[in-house]
Amino acid sequence: VADLGIVGENEFKERNEDAEIVDRLGFSKCRLSLAIPKESKYEGVKWFNGKKIATSYPGILRKFLDKNNVKADIHVITGSVEISPGIGLADGIFDIVSSGSTLVSNNLKEVEVVMKSEALLIRNKQMDEDKMKTLQELLFRFDAVRSAQDKKYVMMNAPKSNIREIVEVLPGIKSPTI
């Protein structure tokens, strides 16, 4: 069993893993959405009543449909979910959407965003104290990288007599390193 992992939030929620979310990593962002043929008239989630929906995420979809009192048939498909309506396997789909270009190329339109997702750092709930200490050091480094993303590092050769003027033009976060 692994102590740490990086996983998409969508996979984490679908599999209902017994792990703890340690950090939201801010990359691999996408959304899980319902989509239907672009020529279909859509007036809300009740459109899916009695319809067939293809997905690789039946657990998340079932919770959403139940919450909205929608009775639909869920067809579990792994890979190329977006072709299902075009070949008559489903009336709509529930899948990952990033830019939406795959939906457009399959004559689909996004009609409901059910959940947003990004990469997560997760941990085994039974990590020992030494590993937790190492994890805290890793998180410190992650935070340092994130806080430095919009900052610039400037190095120069200048006479010490000009330090005051240089600091006025290029102040550091706390102070310059000399």
Annotate each predicted stretch with a short phrase:
Residues 1-4:
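Extracytoplasmic small-molecule ligand-binding "clamshell" domains
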